[in-house]
């Protein structure tokens, strides 16, 4: 009897452990799937549209600056840095999903030329690893190694993101050529205003869906509001739901118009995109250029020596 009770207890504990594990997985998966840049990866085959617009701007409506810095030229099969700067006021707080205030996160997408890719760990120097920190980059798609994404990560620590990039070698990759290539980048700070399904997040302004009078404002237990708007002409009632986060701008009894803001705009972040150019330089061309410069310098030296020799001859003839 005791053995049976022990077995039942063990079975119950195992069942609980499995249930807890499943719950953690679901919560974690939901959190990850709702994070930038997963939205873009799930909804778009290519993050850069034909117009040049990066798709992240579809959800992050405010425009903010970014800056990209890359070398002017690189040699084949060389690791170099692509530095993305996402500036913002570190004192700012954003509205989180639960309506509370918190620090801003940042994220980025780097679109490299075909053949360029994330440098393997064994090719990254200790100095470069220190600059990168604990960032974990990933490819936009398994077959698009030239498009890298990162985020969301804490903005206070990673407002400057260093990408370790490996340049291609045309000797081993037929698609690579010694040319000038464009590099495109997009970076955001803070949460977006619209989800991919078109619904609003709580990090944006909410407008009235009807003209009328605010009859009642009900504050919900978990935060947010239900605003009852009655149309004075026909008595039709509309209820607008406001999630936790935005601050209410209207009061009961107030007359409002269609699309009038009911709340403030809590968004303090935004998205920006930029571009740069990089040259994949042929080593033979560099060697030829160096040889040319050396030849010019030697020619100048010989010319000076010849001139001095000629002056000495002239001086000698004059004295003679």
Curated annotation (Swiss-Prot):
Any one GO molecular function term: iron ion binding
Bridged cysteine pairs (disulfide): none
Cofactor or coenzyme needed: heme
GO biological process: photosynthesis
Location(s) in or outside the cell: Plastid, Chloroplast thylakoid membrane
Transmembrane segments: 286-305
Membrane topology: Single-pass membrane protein
Cofactor annotation comment: Binds 1 heme group covalently.
Keyword annotations: Chloroplast, Electron transport, Heme, Iron, Membrane, Metal-binding, Photosynthesis, Plastid, Signal, Thylakoid, Transmembrane, Transmembrane helix, Transport
Residues binding heme: 36, 56, 59-60
Residues spanning the signal sequence: 1-35
One GO CC term on file: chloroplast thylakoid membrane
Family: Belongs to the cytochrome f family.
Assembly: The 4 large subunits of the cytochrome b6-f complex are cytochrome b6, subunit IV (17 kDa polypeptide, petD), cytochrome f and the Rieske protein, while the 4 small subunits are PetG, PetL, PetM and PetN. The complex functions as a dimer.
Functional description taken from the UniProt entry: Component of the cytochrome b6-f complex, which mediates electron transfer between photosystem II (PSII) and photosystem I (PSI), cyclic electron flow around PSI, and state transitions.
The name this protein goes by in its record: Cytochrome f
Lineage: Eukaryota, Viridiplantae, Streptophyta, Embryophyta, Tracheophyta
